[in-house]
Regions:
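Core catalytic region of metal-dependent phosphoesterases/phosphodiesterases
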Residues: 5-10, 19-114
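Short histidine/acidic/glycine/proline-rich micro-motifs that form metal-
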Residues: 17-20, 127
Length: 259
C-alpha cells in the first residue's frame, strides 16, 4: 500500500531575505525554496524586505530583479496565490512588479481569515514605535506625494539616494547598539496589544526585527519570521507554514521542521 500523500500546506510566510546580487548563496537558497517548497503550497505570503532595496519597478529590466520576478512568476503560474506586503526596504514595489509576478499587493496590516481563525499579517516595522526617528521617516516616505516625486527621478539617481539612506540607517542602528538601546528596534508591547485589540485577532505573523521566535500566551500568539543570510556562517533563514488544521510550523533555511 502506498503511503497517503501529505496534506497540502495552506500558506507559507517569509520575510527579510534582503536579496541582492552581493549575496548569491542567499539568492540561491530563496530560488530553491520557491522551486521545492513554495510551489507545493496554496498561498505564499511575502511579508516585506524581500529585496535589500527596490528603487522602482523600472528596475525590473536589471538581470537580478528579472531573475527574482521570473522565479516568482513560475510559482504563481503553478497555481500558487502570491501576496506581498511591503517592507521598509522594498515599499516602492508597485503595480508593474505585481503584474509581472501575478502577486497581489496587500495593506499592512492585513487580516487573513481562514475558517474561524484570523491571522494578522504585517512586516512589523510600524510596531517598533519606540524608534521615533524611524517612524517619522516611515510616515514621510510612505506618502503618495513623496513616492511620486522620488520615482520621477532617474533610476541611477534613485539608487544613489537609496545607498545614502542605507548608510544612514546602518549608522543609526550602530548608534543605538552603542547606547545599549536595542529595545527600540524591537516591537513595542503596547503597540502589539493595541493591534490585537483593534483587529479582534489572536495570532500575529511578522518579520522586520530579525529576532525569530514564537511568543505564545493564554490569549495570543505572535510569530516572528527569520531574516535570511546563507552567505555567512552560521546560515540563517526559514519560513512559517500554516497547515489545514490551523497549526503553524516553523522551518529552517534547509527545509527542516524545527517546531
Amino acid at each position: 500500500m502506498q503511503p497517503s500523500s501529505p496534506t497540502r500546506t495552506v500558506a507559507l510566510f517569509i520575510s527579510d531575505l534582503h536579496l541582492q546580487p552581493e549575496m548569491p548563496e542567499t539568492t540561491a537558497a530563496f530560488l530553491h525554496f520557491l522551486q521545492r517548497h513554495a510551489i507545493h503550497a496554496k498561498q505564499l505570503y511575502l511579508l516585506g524586505d524581500i529585496f535589500e532595496y527596490w528603487a522602482g519597478d523600472d528596475d525590473l529590466t536589471s538581470p537580478f530583479a528579472h531573475t527574482i520576478a521570473t522565479a516568482l512568476r513560475r510559482v504563481s503560474d503553478a497555481g500558487v496565490a502570491l501576496f506581498w506586503i511591503a517592507g521598509n526596504r522594498d515599499f516602492l514595489v508597485g503595480d508593474v512588479f505585481a503584474k509581472a509576478t501575478q502577486a497581489t499587493l496587500l495593506e499592512d496590516p492585513t487580516i487573513l481569515q481562514l475558517g474561524e481563525n484570523r491571522y494578522i499579517l504585517s512586516h512589523g516595522d510600524q510596531l517598533c514605535t519606540d524608534d521615533v526617528a524611524y517612524q517619522h521617516f516611515r510616515t514621510q516616505v510612505r506618502q503618495s506625494a513623496w513616492k511620486t516625486a522620488f520615482l520621477a527621478r532617474p533610476l541611477a539617481e534613485r539608487k544613489e539616494i537609496i545607498a545614502g539612506m542605507r548608510m544612514q540607517s546602518q549608522q543609526h542602528q550602530k548608534n543605538q547598539l552603542d547606547k545599549h538601546a536595542e529595545r527600540i528596534m524591537d516591537v513595542n508591547p503596547a503597540a502589539v496589544t493595541a493591534l490585537f485589540s483593534r483587529t479582534a485577532s489572536t495570532t500575529l505573523i511578522h518579520g522586520h526585527t530579525h529576532r525569530p521566535g514564537s511568543h505564545l500566551n493564554e490569549t495570543t500568539r505572535r510569530y516572528v519570521l527569520s531574516d535570511w543570510d546563507v552567505d555567512h556562517h552560521p546560515a540563517r533563514g526559514g519560513w512559517l507554514a500554516l497547515q489545514q488544521d490551523g497549526s503553524l510550523l516553523r522551518y529552517n533555511v534547509t527545509g527542516d521542521c524545527i517546531t
